[in-house]
Amino acid sequence: MYIPKHFESMELSRYKLSKKPPLGTLFSSKASRQGFFGWRTSSNKDDPDFGMCASHIPFVFVEFDNGEHKLIAHLARKNKHVEMLERVQKCLVVFQSVDSYISPAWFPMKKKTHKFVPTWDFAAVHVYGTPRIIRDDKDWLINMLSTLTDQEEEKRPEGENVRSKVERF
């Protein structure tokens, strides 16, 4: 992603954006057997060999004492994206905040200098990493779903503690 120098941000800002809201878009891609552009011509989009995949899912952001970070998320077992993630080495998660069109008419100096142009204002964070799939670990799944739910429920005054209820599912 191209970032103009005057819009580069600090680590703390990126951390805050990736935490609130926690919804991110998980992207993965692999080389197609048909060549670099083979994915464009494939008609079977359910095939995990299709080439590209994106899933919109909430994440839990974990920060360790040594300054390293980890994103944790849950995909349904039958989601074809899981198969692709098991076969790729890298993935990308994109978090976005609010965005808005910026009119040059909003700048008072525009009438004098005519040096303002329309633009689009937004905030986004790209997080690159290596996917790790965890299967058949009920304790991990319960803990992950509880942590994700607690992360959101604590924002509500009447937030619920769902940890005890999750085991029924």
From Swiss-Prot:
It comes from the Eukaryota. Disulfide bonds: none annotated. Gene3D superfamilies: Electron Transport, Fmn-binding Protein, Chain A. InterPro entries: Split_barrel_FMN-bd, TR_PAI2-type. One of its GO terms (cellular component) is mitochondrion. This is Uncharacterized protein YKL070W. It comes from Saccharomyces cerevisiae (strain ATCC 204508 / S288c).
